[in-house]
Curated annotation (Swiss-Prot):
Origin organism lineage: Eukaryota, Metazoa, Chordata, Craniata, Vertebrata
Disruption phenotype: Mutants show normal fecundity, fertility and longevity up tp 2 year. They have reduced serum 3-hydroxy-L-kynurenine concentrations. They are protected against extrapancreatic tissue injury to the lung, kidney and liver produced by acute pancreatitis-induced multiple organ dysfunction syndrome.
Pfam families, per the entry: FAD_binding_3
Tissue: Expressed by organs containing secondary lymphoid tissue, such as the lung, spleen, mesenteric lymph node, thymus and peripheral lymph nodes.
Binding site for L-kynurenine: 85, 99, 363, 398
Name of the molecule in the record: Kynurenine 3-monooxygenase
Residues at which FAD binds: 19, 37-40, 57, 111, 136, 172, 304, 317-318
Cofactor(s) listed in the protein's UniProt record: FAD
Domain writeup: Transmembrane domains are required for enzymatic activity.
Membrane topology (UniProt): Multi-pass membrane protein
Pathway(s) the chain acts in: Cofactor biosynthesis; NAD(+) biosynthesis; quinolinate from L-kynurenine: step 1/3
Enzyme Commission numbers on file: 1.14.13.9
Function: Catalyzes the hydroxylation of L-kynurenine (L-Kyn) to form 3-hydroxy-L-kynurenine (L-3OHKyn). Required for synthesis of quinolinic acid, a neurotoxic NMDA receptor antagonist and potential endogenous inhibitor of NMDA receptor signaling in axonal targeting, synaptogenesis and apoptosis during brain development. Quinolinic acid may also affect NMDA receptor signaling in pancreatic beta cells, osteoblasts, myocardial cells, and the gastrointestinal tract.
Amino acid sequence: MASSDTQGKRVAVIGGGLVGALNACFLAKRNFQVDVYEAREDIRVAKSARGRSINLALSYRGRQALKAIGLEDQIVSKGVPMKARMIHSLSGKKSAIPYGNKSQYILSISRENLNKDLLTAVESYANAKVHFGHKLSKCIPEEGVLTVLGPDKVPRDVTCDLVVGCDGAYSTVRAHLMKKPRFDYTQQYIPHGYMELTIPPKNGEYAMEPNCLHIWPRNAYMMIALPNMDKSFTCTLFMPFEEFERLPTRSDVLDFFQKNFPDAIPLMGEQALMRDFFLLPAQPMISVKCSPFHLKSHCVLMGDAAHAIVPFFGQGMNAGFEDCLVFDELMDKFNNNLSMCLPEFSRFRIPDDHAISDLSMYNYIEMRAHVNSRWFLFQKLLDKFLHAIMPSTFIPLYTMVAFTRIRYHEAVLRWHWQKKVINRGLFVLGSLIAIGGTYLLVHHLSLRPLEFLRRPAWMGTTGYWTRSTDISLQVPWSY
Protein backbone atom coordinates (compact mmCIF):
# COMPACT_ATOMS: atom_id res chain seq x y z
CA MET A 1 0.00 0.00 0.00
CA ALA A 2 1.11 3.57 -0.54
CA SER A 3 1.70 5.45 2.67
CA SER A 4 -0.12 8.48 1.23
CA ASP A 5 -3.37 6.49 1.40
CA THR A 6 -3.44 6.71 5.18
CA GLN A 7 -0.70 9.10 6.25
CA GLY A 8 -2.16 11.93 8.28
CA LYS A 9 -5.46 10.16 8.91
CA ARG A 10 -6.24 9.70 12.58
CA VAL A 11 -7.81 6.61 14.10
CA ALA A 12 -9.18 6.48 17.63
CA VAL A 13 -9.19 2.97 19.08
CA ILE A 14 -11.47 2.83 22.10
CA GLY A 15 -10.22 0.16 24.48
CA GLY A 16 -6.69 -1.04 25.11
CA GLY A 17 -7.52 -4.66 25.84
CA LEU A 18 -6.46 -7.60 23.69
CA VAL A 19 -8.40 -6.73 20.54
CA GLY A 20 -7.90 -2.99 20.86
CA ALA A 21 -4.13 -3.31 21.24
CA LEU A 22 -3.85 -5.77 18.36
CA ASN A 23 -5.97 -3.53 16.15
CA ALA A 24 -3.76 -0.57 16.98
CA CYS A 25 -0.75 -2.54 15.73
CA PHE A 26 -2.46 -3.39 12.43
CA LEU A 27 -3.54 0.23 11.90
CA ALA A 28 -0.16 1.66 12.87
CA LYS A 29 1.48 -0.63 10.29
CA ARG A 30 -0.72 1.08 7.71
CA ASN A 31 0.67 4.48 8.71
CA PHE A 32 -2.48 5.76 10.39
CA GLN A 33 -1.95 8.08 13.33
CA VAL A 34 -3.34 5.85 16.08
CA ASP A 35 -4.56 6.92 19.51
CA VAL A 36 -5.70 4.21 21.92
CA TYR A 37 -7.95 5.38 24.75
CA GLU A 38 -8.01 2.96 27.69
CA ALA A 39 -10.10 3.62 30.80
CA ARG A 40 -7.88 1.52 33.09
CA GLU A 41 -4.42 2.35 34.31
CA ASP A 42 -1.44 0.74 32.62
CA ILE A 43 -1.56 -2.93 33.70
CA ARG A 44 2.20 -3.17 33.20
CA VAL A 45 2.76 -0.93 36.22
CA ALA A 46 -0.45 -1.55 38.17
CA LYS A 47 -0.02 -3.17 41.59
CA SER A 48 -2.86 -5.63 41.04
CA ALA A 49 -4.68 -6.64 37.89
CA ARG A 50 -6.89 -9.32 39.41
CA GLY A 51 -10.38 -9.46 37.93
CA ARG A 52 -11.61 -10.91 34.70
CA SER A 53 -8.97 -13.55 34.04
CA ILE A 54 -10.37 -16.76 32.63
CA ASN A 55 -7.26 -18.23 31.03
CA LEU A 56 -7.18 -17.99 27.27
CA ALA A 57 -6.89 -20.76 24.70
CA LEU A 58 -4.93 -19.49 21.71
CA SER A 59 -5.59 -21.44 18.52
CA TYR A 60 -4.87 -21.14 14.80
CA ARG A 61 -7.02 -18.09 14.01
CA GLY A 62 -5.50 -16.03 16.78
CA ARG A 63 -2.00 -17.17 15.90
CA GLN A 64 -2.46 -16.11 12.27
CA ALA A 65 -3.42 -12.62 13.41
CA LEU A 66 -0.38 -12.41 15.68
CA LYS A 67 1.80 -13.72 12.86
CA ALA A 68 0.64 -10.90 10.60
CA ILE A 69 2.16 -8.32 12.96
CA GLY A 70 5.24 -10.39 13.77
CA LEU A 71 4.30 -11.42 17.33
CA GLU A 72 3.39 -15.09 16.94
CA ASP A 73 6.70 -16.61 18.04
CA GLN A 74 7.01 -14.28 21.02
CA ILE A 75 3.52 -15.09 22.30
CA VAL A 76 3.66 -18.82 21.56
CA SER A 77 6.89 -19.13 23.55
CA LYS A 78 4.95 -17.99 26.63
CA GLY A 79 2.13 -20.51 26.26
CA VAL A 80 1.64 -24.10 27.43
CA PRO A 81 0.53 -26.56 24.71
CA MET A 82 -2.69 -28.46 25.40
CA LYS A 83 -3.18 -31.52 23.18
CA ALA A 84 -6.27 -33.03 24.78
CA ARG A 85 -9.18 -32.66 27.15
CA MET A 86 -8.60 -34.61 30.35
CA ILE A 87 -11.96 -35.67 31.78
CA HIS A 88 -12.14 -36.18 35.55
CA SER A 89 -15.02 -38.44 36.59
CA LEU A 90 -16.62 -38.29 40.02
CA SER A 91 -14.88 -41.55 40.93
CA GLY A 92 -11.49 -40.00 40.22
CA LYS A 93 -10.94 -41.82 36.93
CA LYS A 94 -9.29 -39.73 34.21
CA SER A 95 -9.61 -40.14 30.44
CA ALA A 96 -8.00 -38.08 27.67
CA ILE A 97 -9.81 -36.96 24.52
CA PRO A 98 -7.31 -35.55 21.96
CA TYR A 99 -8.22 -32.27 20.26
CA GLY A 100 -6.88 -33.41 16.91
CA ASN A 101 -3.94 -35.33 15.50
CA LYS A 102 -0.60 -35.62 17.29
CA SER A 103 0.72 -32.37 15.86
CA GLN A 104 -2.34 -30.26 16.74
CA TYR A 105 -2.69 -28.41 20.01
CA ILE A 106 -4.03 -25.21 21.49
CA LEU A 107 -2.07 -22.95 23.83
CA SER A 108 -2.90 -21.89 27.36
CA ILE A 109 -2.07 -18.19 27.54
CA SER A 110 -2.17 -15.69 30.39
CA ARG A 111 -4.60 -12.88 29.54
CA GLU A 112 -2.60 -10.37 31.56
CA ASN A 113 0.78 -11.22 30.05
CA LEU A 114 -0.62 -11.24 26.51
CA ASN A 115 -2.20 -7.82 27.04
CA LYS A 116 1.09 -6.46 28.37
CA ASP A 117 2.99 -7.73 25.32
CA LEU A 118 0.44 -6.24 22.93
CA LEU A 119 0.54 -2.84 24.63
CA THR A 120 4.33 -2.84 24.41
CA ALA A 121 4.03 -3.72 20.71
CA VAL A 122 1.68 -0.76 20.15
CA GLU A 123 4.15 1.63 21.74
CA SER A 124 6.91 0.36 19.46
CA TYR A 125 5.25 2.28 16.60
CA ALA A 126 6.18 5.95 16.43
CA ASN A 127 2.74 6.82 15.04
CA ALA A 128 0.79 5.14 17.87
CA LYS A 129 0.10 6.26 21.42
CA VAL A 130 -1.82 4.69 24.30
CA HIS A 131 -3.69 7.08 26.62
CA PHE A 132 -4.27 5.28 29.92
CA GLY A 133 -6.92 6.47 32.36
CA HIS A 134 -8.94 8.02 29.51
CA LYS A 135 -12.61 7.06 29.43
CA LEU A 136 -14.94 7.73 26.50
CA SER A 137 -17.96 9.77 27.59
CA LYS A 138 -19.44 10.94 24.29
CA CYS A 139 -19.14 9.76 20.71
CA ILE A 140 -20.32 11.46 17.51
CA PRO A 141 -18.58 9.31 14.88
CA GLU A 142 -20.32 10.99 11.90
CA GLU A 143 -18.54 14.19 12.82
CA GLY A 144 -15.36 12.45 13.93
CA VAL A 145 -15.64 13.92 17.42
CA LEU A 146 -15.09 12.12 20.72
CA THR A 147 -15.20 13.40 24.27
CA VAL A 148 -12.90 11.65 26.72
CA LEU A 149 -12.33 12.07 30.43
CA GLY A 150 -8.69 11.92 31.46
CA PRO A 151 -7.28 11.12 34.91
CA ASP A 152 -8.17 14.69 35.94
CA LYS A 153 -11.84 14.03 34.99
CA VAL A 154 -11.82 17.08 32.71
CA PRO A 155 -13.72 16.50 29.42
CA ARG A 156 -11.58 16.85 26.33
CA ASP A 157 -12.73 16.72 22.70
CA VAL A 158 -10.61 14.84 20.18
CA THR A 159 -11.11 14.47 16.44
CA CYS A 160 -10.45 11.50 14.20
CA ASP A 161 -11.25 10.03 10.79
CA LEU A 162 -12.22 6.58 12.12
CA VAL A 163 -13.50 5.29 15.46
CA VAL A 164 -12.74 1.64 16.24
CA GLY A 165 -14.81 0.34 19.13
CA CYS A 166 -12.92 -2.39 21.00
CA ASP A 167 -14.25 -1.54 24.44
CA GLY A 168 -15.73 -4.88 25.40
CA ALA A 169 -19.11 -6.43 26.07
CA TYR A 170 -20.44 -3.25 27.71
CA SER A 171 -19.15 -1.06 24.89
CA THR A 172 -19.72 2.70 25.13
CA VAL A 173 -19.17 3.04 21.37
CA ARG A 174 -21.86 0.43 20.67
CA ALA A 175 -24.22 2.20 23.07
CA HIS A 176 -23.99 5.30 20.89
CA LEU A 177 -24.56 3.28 17.70
CA MET A 178 -27.67 1.73 19.26
CA LYS A 179 -29.34 5.13 19.05
CA LYS A 180 -29.07 4.99 15.27
CA PRO A 181 -31.93 3.61 13.15
CA ARG A 182 -31.69 0.04 11.80
CA PHE A 183 -29.13 -1.04 14.37
CA ASP A 184 -30.07 -4.42 15.88
CA TYR A 185 -28.88 -5.56 19.29
CA THR A 186 -29.55 -8.53 21.56
CA GLN A 187 -27.93 -9.73 24.77
CA GLN A 188 -28.35 -12.80 26.94
CA TYR A 189 -26.97 -13.63 30.37
CA ILE A 190 -26.61 -17.34 30.97
CA PRO A 191 -27.72 -18.75 34.36
CA HIS A 192 -24.17 -19.72 35.27
CA GLY A 193 -21.49 -17.57 36.83
CA TYR A 194 -17.78 -18.28 37.08
CA MET A 195 -15.19 -18.15 39.82
CA GLU A 196 -11.43 -18.47 39.56
CA LEU A 197 -9.49 -20.90 41.75
CA THR A 198 -5.87 -22.13 41.71
CA ILE A 199 -3.97 -25.41 41.81
CA PRO A 200 -0.39 -24.58 42.91
CA PRO A 201 2.73 -26.48 41.82
CA LYS A 202 3.57 -29.68 43.68
CA ASN A 203 7.23 -30.01 44.63
CA GLY A 204 8.08 -27.47 41.94
CA GLU A 205 6.28 -29.38 39.19
CA TYR A 206 2.78 -29.53 37.73
CA ALA A 207 0.33 -31.27 40.08
CA MET A 208 -1.51 -32.81 37.07
CA GLU A 209 -0.76 -33.62 33.44
CA PRO A 210 0.41 -30.25 32.05
CA ASN A 211 -0.45 -30.64 28.37
CA CYS A 212 -4.19 -30.99 28.83
CA LEU A 213 -7.22 -28.85 29.48
CA HIS A 214 -8.69 -30.54 32.55
CA ILE A 215 -12.48 -30.78 32.85
CA TRP A 216 -14.62 -31.94 35.76
CA PRO A 217 -18.07 -32.24 34.10
CA ARG A 218 -20.95 -32.50 36.57
CA ASN A 219 -24.03 -31.84 34.37
CA ALA A 220 -25.44 -28.75 36.12
CA TYR A 221 -21.95 -27.35 36.71
CA MET A 222 -18.33 -28.01 35.89
CA MET A 223 -14.79 -26.97 36.63
CA ILE A 224 -11.89 -26.57 34.21
CA ALA A 225 -8.15 -26.09 34.77
CA LEU A 226 -5.58 -24.66 32.35
CA PRO A 227 -1.81 -24.91 32.88
CA ASN A 228 0.39 -21.87 33.44
CA MET A 229 4.08 -21.34 32.74
CA ASP A 230 4.84 -21.20 36.50
CA LYS A 231 3.67 -24.85 36.89
CA SER A 232 0.35 -23.83 38.47
CA PHE A 233 -3.14 -24.32 37.04
CA THR A 234 -5.80 -21.65 36.76
CA CYS A 235 -9.13 -23.29 37.59
CA THR A 236 -12.53 -21.88 36.73
CA LEU A 237 -15.68 -23.11 38.44
CA PHE A 238 -18.86 -22.64 36.36
CA MET A 239 -22.09 -23.00 38.30
CA PRO A 240 -25.62 -21.52 38.48
CA PHE A 241 -25.71 -18.43 40.67
CA GLU A 242 -28.28 -20.16 42.88
CA GLU A 243 -25.69 -22.83 43.69
CA PHE A 244 -23.08 -20.22 44.61
CA GLU A 245 -25.61 -18.61 46.94
CA ARG A 246 -26.06 -21.95 48.74
CA LEU A 247 -22.39 -21.90 49.79
CA PRO A 248 -22.11 -19.02 52.28
CA THR A 249 -19.72 -20.69 54.74
CA ARG A 250 -16.40 -22.50 54.62
CA SER A 251 -17.98 -25.78 55.72
CA ASP A 252 -20.59 -25.49 52.94
CA VAL A 253 -17.85 -25.03 50.35
CA LEU A 254 -15.81 -27.94 51.67
CA ASP A 255 -18.85 -30.24 51.73
CA PHE A 256 -19.71 -29.21 48.17
CA PHE A 257 -16.21 -29.96 46.88
CA GLN A 258 -16.00 -33.25 48.77
CA LYS A 259 -19.25 -34.31 47.11
CA ASN A 260 -18.56 -33.06 43.57
CA PHE A 261 -14.80 -32.53 43.11
CA PRO A 262 -13.14 -34.74 45.75
CA ASP A 263 -9.93 -35.24 43.77
CA ALA A 264 -9.44 -31.46 43.41
CA ILE A 265 -9.30 -30.72 47.16
CA PRO A 266 -5.82 -32.20 47.83
CA LEU A 267 -4.55 -30.53 44.64
CA MET A 268 -5.75 -27.08 45.70
CA GLY A 269 -5.34 -27.40 49.45
CA GLU A 270 -8.23 -26.58 51.78
CA GLN A 271 -6.83 -23.24 52.93
CA ALA A 272 -6.08 -22.03 49.40
CA LEU A 273 -9.50 -23.19 48.21
CA MET A 274 -11.25 -21.15 50.92
CA ARG A 275 -9.07 -18.11 50.25
CA ASP A 276 -9.79 -18.12 46.51
CA PHE A 277 -13.47 -19.00 46.82
CA PHE A 278 -14.30 -16.05 49.07
CA LEU A 279 -11.90 -13.55 47.46
CA LEU A 280 -14.33 -12.38 44.76
CA PRO A 281 -18.01 -13.08 44.08
CA ALA A 282 -19.04 -15.19 41.10
CA GLN A 283 -18.93 -13.21 37.86
CA PRO A 284 -21.66 -13.18 35.16
CA MET A 285 -21.26 -14.24 31.54
CA ILE A 286 -23.03 -12.43 28.73
CA SER A 287 -23.58 -13.15 25.05
CA VAL A 288 -24.01 -10.13 22.76
CA LYS A 289 -25.04 -9.92 19.12
CA CYS A 290 -25.48 -6.80 17.04
CA SER A 291 -25.77 -5.77 13.40
CA PRO A 292 -24.27 -4.00 11.53
CA PHE A 293 -20.75 -3.71 12.89
CA HIS A 294 -20.16 -0.33 11.25
CA LEU A 295 -21.57 3.15 10.74
CA LYS A 296 -20.88 4.40 7.21
CA SER A 297 -17.14 5.05 6.88
CA HIS A 298 -16.78 6.55 10.35
CA CYS A 299 -17.00 3.78 12.93
CA VAL A 300 -16.54 0.01 13.28
CA LEU A 301 -16.96 -2.45 16.17
CA MET A 302 -14.69 -5.45 16.78
CA GLY A 303 -14.16 -8.10 19.43
CA ASP A 304 -16.54 -8.28 22.39
CA ALA A 305 -17.97 -4.87 21.50
CA ALA A 306 -19.42 -6.50 18.37
CA HIS A 307 -19.98 -10.07 19.55
CA ALA A 308 -19.31 -10.98 23.17
CA ILE A 309 -19.55 -14.76 23.50
CA VAL A 310 -19.54 -17.24 26.38
CA PRO A 311 -16.13 -18.89 26.87
CA PHE A 312 -17.03 -22.53 26.29
CA PHE A 313 -15.47 -22.98 22.84
CA GLY A 314 -12.32 -21.06 23.66
CA GLN A 315 -12.86 -18.75 20.69
CA GLY A 316 -13.64 -15.34 22.19
CA MET A 317 -10.12 -13.97 21.80
CA ASN A 318 -9.49 -15.91 18.59
CA ALA A 319 -12.64 -14.54 16.97
CA GLY A 320 -11.71 -11.02 18.05
CA PHE A 321 -8.17 -11.40 16.70
CA GLU A 322 -9.56 -12.76 13.44
CA ASP A 323 -11.77 -9.64 13.22
CA CYS A 324 -8.57 -7.58 13.13
CA LEU A 325 -6.99 -9.85 10.53
CA VAL A 326 -10.06 -9.88 8.28
CA PHE A 327 -10.30 -6.09 8.48
CA ASP A 328 -6.64 -5.80 7.52
CA GLU A 329 -7.16 -8.17 4.58
CA LEU A 330 -10.14 -6.09 3.42
CA MET A 331 -8.07 -2.92 3.68
CA ASP A 332 -5.61 -4.55 1.28
CA LYS A 333 -8.43 -5.58 -1.04
CA PHE A 334 -10.01 -2.10 -1.15
CA ASN A 335 -6.77 -0.09 -1.06
CA ASN A 336 -7.56 1.46 2.35
CA ASN A 337 -10.90 2.83 1.15
CA LEU A 338 -12.88 2.99 4.40
CA SER A 339 -16.21 3.69 2.70
CA MET A 340 -15.90 0.31 0.93
CA CYS A 341 -14.07 -1.64 3.59
CA LEU A 342 -16.40 -1.04 6.55
CA PRO A 343 -19.67 -2.19 4.90
CA GLU A 344 -17.89 -5.26 3.51
CA PHE A 345 -16.51 -6.05 6.94
CA SER A 346 -20.04 -6.14 8.37
CA ARG A 347 -21.39 -8.19 5.48
CA PHE A 348 -18.53 -10.68 5.62
CA ARG A 349 -18.02 -10.99 9.35
CA ILE A 350 -21.48 -10.92 10.96
CA PRO A 351 -22.51 -14.48 9.87
CA ASP A 352 -19.23 -15.86 11.22
CA ASP A 353 -19.29 -14.08 14.57
CA HIS A 354 -22.93 -14.99 15.15
CA ALA A 355 -22.12 -18.61 14.26
CA ILE A 356 -19.31 -18.90 16.81
CA SER A 357 -21.58 -17.31 19.40
CA ASP A 358 -24.16 -20.06 18.80
CA LEU A 359 -21.48 -22.76 18.84
CA SER A 360 -20.19 -21.48 22.17
CA MET A 361 -23.70 -21.77 23.62
CA TYR A 362 -23.89 -25.34 22.29
CA ASN A 363 -20.53 -26.21 23.83
CA TYR A 364 -21.77 -24.76 27.12
CA ILE A 365 -23.98 -27.87 27.39
CA GLU A 366 -21.55 -30.32 25.77
CA MET A 367 -18.64 -29.60 28.11
CA ARG A 368 -20.56 -30.00 31.37
CA ALA A 369 -22.80 -32.92 30.33
CA HIS A 370 -22.12 -34.68 27.02
CA VAL A 371 -18.43 -35.43 27.57
CA ASN A 372 -19.50 -37.93 30.23
CA SER A 373 -21.45 -40.09 27.78
CA ARG A 374 -20.17 -43.11 25.88
CA TRP A 375 -22.08 -41.91 22.82
CA PHE A 376 -20.01 -38.70 22.85
CA LEU A 377 -16.78 -40.72 23.02
CA PHE A 378 -17.99 -42.97 20.20
CA GLN A 379 -18.77 -39.92 18.05
CA LYS A 380 -15.30 -38.50 18.68
CA LEU A 381 -13.66 -41.80 17.71
CA LEU A 382 -15.84 -42.05 14.60
CA ASP A 383 -15.01 -38.46 13.61
CA LYS A 384 -11.31 -39.20 14.05
CA PHE A 385 -11.54 -42.39 11.98
CA LEU A 386 -13.48 -40.75 9.13
CA HIS A 387 -11.10 -37.77 9.10
CA ALA A 388 -8.12 -40.15 8.92
CA ILE A 389 -9.43 -42.00 5.86
CA MET A 390 -11.13 -38.99 4.18
CA PRO A 391 -9.27 -35.90 5.46
CA SER A 392 -10.69 -33.49 2.90
CA THR A 393 -14.28 -34.78 3.12
CA PHE A 394 -14.86 -35.27 6.84
CA ILE A 395 -13.35 -32.70 9.19
CA PRO A 396 -14.39 -32.73 12.87
CA LEU A 397 -16.11 -29.56 14.03
CA TYR A 398 -13.44 -28.74 16.61
CA THR A 399 -10.71 -29.17 14.00
CA MET A 400 -12.46 -26.75 11.63
CA VAL A 401 -12.89 -24.17 14.38
CA ALA A 402 -9.56 -24.43 16.20
CA PHE A 403 -7.06 -25.54 13.55
CA THR A 404 -8.21 -23.89 10.29
CA ARG A 405 -9.52 -20.57 9.04
CA ILE A 406 -12.63 -22.11 7.51
CA ARG A 407 -15.26 -19.44 8.10
CA TYR A 408 -17.22 -20.12 11.27
CA HIS A 409 -20.62 -20.21 9.59
CA GLU A 410 -19.30 -22.51 6.85
CA ALA A 411 -17.90 -24.83 9.53
CA VAL A 412 -21.36 -25.03 11.11
CA LEU A 413 -23.03 -25.82 7.76
CA ARG A 414 -20.43 -28.48 7.02
CA TRP A 415 -20.79 -29.95 10.51
CA HIS A 416 -24.56 -30.32 10.07
CA TRP A 417 -24.05 -31.98 6.67
CA GLN A 418 -21.47 -34.40 8.10
CA LYS A 419 -23.76 -35.30 11.00
CA LYS A 420 -26.58 -36.02 8.55
CA VAL A 421 -24.35 -38.25 6.41
CA ILE A 422 -22.98 -40.10 9.44
CA ASN A 423 -26.43 -40.63 10.96
CA ARG A 424 -27.77 -41.96 7.66
CA GLY A 425 -24.76 -44.22 7.31
CA LEU A 426 -25.26 -45.59 10.82
CA PHE A 427 -28.96 -46.12 10.08
CA VAL A 428 -28.19 -48.05 6.89
CA LEU A 429 -25.53 -50.10 8.66
CA GLY A 430 -27.89 -50.85 11.52
CA SER A 431 -30.64 -51.81 9.08
CA LEU A 432 -28.34 -54.19 7.20
CA ILE A 433 -27.25 -55.82 10.46
CA ALA A 434 -30.88 -56.21 11.54
CA ILE A 435 -31.94 -57.67 8.17
CA GLY A 436 -28.99 -60.05 8.12
CA GLY A 437 -29.64 -61.17 11.66
CA THR A 438 -33.32 -61.72 10.96
CA TYR A 439 -32.52 -63.76 7.84
CA LEU A 440 -30.11 -66.02 9.73
CA LEU A 441 -32.58 -66.49 12.57
CA VAL A 442 -35.45 -67.41 10.23
CA HIS A 443 -33.18 -69.69 8.21
CA HIS A 444 -32.16 -71.69 11.29
CA LEU A 445 -35.66 -71.83 12.78
CA SER A 446 -37.04 -73.26 9.50
CA LEU A 447 -34.99 -76.47 9.85
CA ARG A 448 -35.99 -79.93 11.24
CA PRO A 449 -37.49 -78.99 14.62
CA LEU A 450 -40.56 -77.73 12.71
CA GLU A 451 -40.96 -80.84 10.56
CA PHE A 452 -43.56 -82.40 12.90
CA LEU A 453 -45.90 -79.53 12.04
CA ARG A 454 -45.93 -80.74 8.44
CA ARG A 455 -46.67 -84.45 9.30
CA PRO A 456 -50.20 -85.89 8.59
CA ALA A 457 -52.56 -85.33 11.48
CA TRP A 458 -53.51 -89.05 11.77
CA MET A 459 -49.95 -89.95 12.68
CA GLY A 460 -50.30 -87.93 15.85
CA THR A 461 -47.33 -86.89 17.88
CA THR A 462 -46.91 -89.85 20.19
CA GLY A 463 -45.11 -91.97 17.64
CA TYR A 464 -42.94 -89.06 16.66
CA TRP A 465 -41.73 -88.35 20.16
CA THR A 466 -41.41 -92.09 20.89
CA ARG A 467 -39.11 -92.51 17.95
CA SER A 468 -37.24 -89.44 18.98
CA THR A 469 -36.21 -91.09 22.22
CA ASP A 470 -34.04 -93.49 20.26
CA ILE A 471 -31.97 -90.67 18.81
CA SER A 472 -30.74 -87.31 19.96
CA LEU A 473 -33.33 -84.55 19.92
CA GLN A 474 -32.76 -82.68 16.67
CA VAL A 475 -32.82 -78.97 17.39
CA PRO A 476 -30.73 -76.23 15.75
CA TRP A 477 -28.03 -76.18 18.43
CA SER A 478 -27.47 -80.00 18.06
CA TYR A 479 -26.19 -79.71 14.48
